[in-house]
């Protein structure tokens, strides 16, 4: 008898254990609309579940109540759409000062490319679209195509 990789094994009378549900661990709580040391404000309310690191230069902010997502600063929407992978439904705002902000995994968005948005205006709703592990906002700040640490702008 041999068992090959990928082969399904059926055990009569066997029981499949349910996978444990792992609660999201909030590293820190933040409040939408609170201004950081630069012009950017926090884009939503919730708990930080992932800080920026070399392989993930973004903030992940989770909140099971699916709160609104706000423009971190004024600017022009350069992209608003949905992908079946990666960022899922997302919005990119060009702030006209060399910076862009990206808001990903939205359940819905309320802006279109070309729209002008004011700081703090609602651009969407937190979701779990694309390649996502649960309800959260993936928030990036970019300059010249380079991802920057959002905390440098929000602290």
Describe the function of each predicted region.
Residues 1, 109-121, 145:
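Acidic, glycine-anchored pre-beta loop/turn
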Residues 1-3, 130:
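Short acidic, glycine/serine/threonine-rich helix-capping segments at coil-helix boundaries
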Residues 4-88, 119, 148:
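Surface-exposed, glycine-biased beta-strand/turn segments
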Residues 49, 76-78, 107, 124-127:
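Conserved positions in beta-strands of structured domains
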Residues 72-110, 135-140:
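Zn2+-dependent peptidoglycan hydrolase active-site motif and core
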Residues 75, 114-129:
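Active-site-proximal beta-strands of protease catalytic cores
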């Amino acid at each position: 008898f041999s068992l090959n990789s990928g082969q399904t094994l059926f055990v009569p009378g066997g029981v499949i254990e349910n996978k444990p549900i792992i609660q999201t661990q909030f590293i820190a709580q933040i409040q939408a609309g609170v201004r950081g040391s630069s012009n950017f404000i926090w884009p939503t309310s919730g708990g930080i579940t992932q800080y920026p690191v070399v392989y993930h230069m973004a903030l992940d902010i989770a909140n099971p109540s699916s709160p609104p997502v706000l423009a971190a600063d004024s600017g022009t929407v350069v992209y608003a759409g949905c992908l079946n992978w990666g960022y899922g439904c997302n919005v990119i705002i060009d702030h006209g000062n060399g910076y862009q902000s990206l808001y990903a995994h939205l359940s819905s968005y309320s802006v279109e490319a070309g729209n002008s948005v004011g700081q703090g205006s609602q651009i969407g709703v937190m979701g779990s679209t694309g390649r996502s592990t649960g309800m959260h906002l993936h928030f990036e700040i970019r300059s010249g195509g380079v991802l920057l640490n959002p905390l440098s702008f929000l602290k």
